[in-house]
Amino acid sequence: EILKIIEKFLKIHIKNQINSGAEIIQIFDSWAGLLDSKDLDKYIYNPTFSLVEFTKTLDVPVICFPRGIKDYKKYCDIIQPDVICIDYEIDPAQIVKDIKIPVQGGMNPQILLTDKENLKKEAKRYLDIFKDHPYIFNLGHGVLPETNPSMMEYLVKIVKDY
């Protein structure tokens, strides 16, 4: 089965990353949210759990980013990552209620295409929601190519000054 072959090579890659100095591993599954619930065990939960379990045997923490997954709580209960990375389609206030492990991300990168006032308001909203929860500030997906670098600099300042 092709998934087993991919999983085998991912474990080799993870081990090589750790041997080269990686102190944490992040597993991205950018297509997790596109699957029907009946396919999640076979294509998401089982292989991802195997990778997380393997990485933890090497004493390295794991961040998982199942973009678009509908039920983050169930995902965390099954996969047991050390940190869960959320996308911008999920309600951060609900995540704080449902998830006890550290959370990373969530803010929509589109906000960086607006103005400083909107950016500050949205960044502070995330910071306020997660103020009593272990949180790594990050976007809910990558920086868009048309983003003005000065807006990224401003965002970093907002977070550092919080």
Task: Provide a role label for each language-model segment.
Residues 1-162:
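Active-site loop segments of alpha/beta catalytic cores
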